[in-house]
């Protein structure tokens, strides 16, 4: 289902965002780490947001490239892997396609991962 970025968020979408923001980062989870407290990253198609349902949980490192306090970006890359800010190609190579990330996010929200 496609939504414009200016479309109002429904109650169900707001609940999903709340679960994502309180949940685990999908990239950290793939590396066997748990990082709770995330941004809801909207997946894109052709440079445009697909819709509010097409969003995944990413920690501040994986979403915005913000390292943990006292840790340098190279140290973060070594331990946590690439950030989306390092470029989408390296991020997707490490963690999967948008479709794979969304599938994993849905499994995590259902408690299956």
Identify the role of each PLM range.
Residues 8, 42-48:
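Short helix/strand-bridging catalytic loops that position acidic/His residues to coordinate divalent metals
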Residues 35-43, 67-72:
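Short Cys/His-rich "knuckle" micro-motifs
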Residues 1-3, 7:
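Charge-rich, low-complexity N-terminal segments
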């Amino acid at each position: 289902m496609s939504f414009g970025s200016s479309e109002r968020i429904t109650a169900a979408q707001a609940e999903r965002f709340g679960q994502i923001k309180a949940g685990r980062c999908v990239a950290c989870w793939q590396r066997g780490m748990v990082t709770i407290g995330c941004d809801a990253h909207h997946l894109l198609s052709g440079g445009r947001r697909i819709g509010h349902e097409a969003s995944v949980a990413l920690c501040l490192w994986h979403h915005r490239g913000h390292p943990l306090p006292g840790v340098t970006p190279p140290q973060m890359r070594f331990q946590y892997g690439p950030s989306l800010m390092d470029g989408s190609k390296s991020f997707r190579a490490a963690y999967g396609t948008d479709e794979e990330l969304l599938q994993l996010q849905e499994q995590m929200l259902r408690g299956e991962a």
